[in-house]
């Protein structure tokens, strides 16, 4: 086998072996990204982990709450790196804190939300990512 073919075969093998990791990260296609909902709730758990931060919130009130939405919700944020650039830390949330969530609901209606931003009791907004309205860039 020529050197060129050996290199080509090695590259193909490397691509084939890493294929699982290339597609392992899910997209946000499970969320209704063109729809925002607002819920108020109490933090149950906050997980500062990669690939996405997660927290669990007991939802009881909010402008978009009906009896079907009351309950424990899983909230998905960005990676710890992305969240840190938005002002989040490992200590941002504590169980028992009351917060307001604005985000994108699951398409299948299950109790999950992709975070757009959170409003703390002091009124401060913390965003999931850098995408935010220009008039709120300094908040």
Report the location of each language-model feature.
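Short nucleic-acid-contacting surface segments enriched for D/E, G, S/T with interspersed K/R
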Residues: 85-100
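Short, structured beta-strand/loop micro-motifs enriched in basic residues and often containing a Trp
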Residues: 76-85
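OB-fold/S1-family single-stranded nucleic acid-binding modules
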Residues: 106-130
């Amino acid at each position: 086998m020529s050197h060129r073919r050996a290199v080509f075969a090695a590259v193909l093998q490397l691509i084939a072996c890493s294929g699982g990791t290339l597609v392992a990260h899910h997209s946000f296609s499970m969320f209704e990204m063109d729809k925002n909902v607002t819920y108020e709730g109490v933090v149950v758990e906050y997980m500062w982990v990669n690939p996405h931060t997660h927290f669990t919130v007991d939802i009881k009130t909010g402008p978009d709450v009906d009896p079907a939405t009351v309950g424990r919700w899983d909230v998905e944020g960005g990676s710890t790196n992305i969240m840190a650039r938005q002002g989040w830390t490992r200590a941002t949330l504590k169980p028992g804190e009351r917060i307001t969530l604005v985000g994108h609901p699951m398409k299948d209606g299950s109790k999950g939300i992709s975070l757009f931003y959170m409003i703390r009791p002091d009124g401060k907004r913390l965003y999931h990512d850098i995408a935010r309205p220009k008039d709120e860039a300094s908040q």
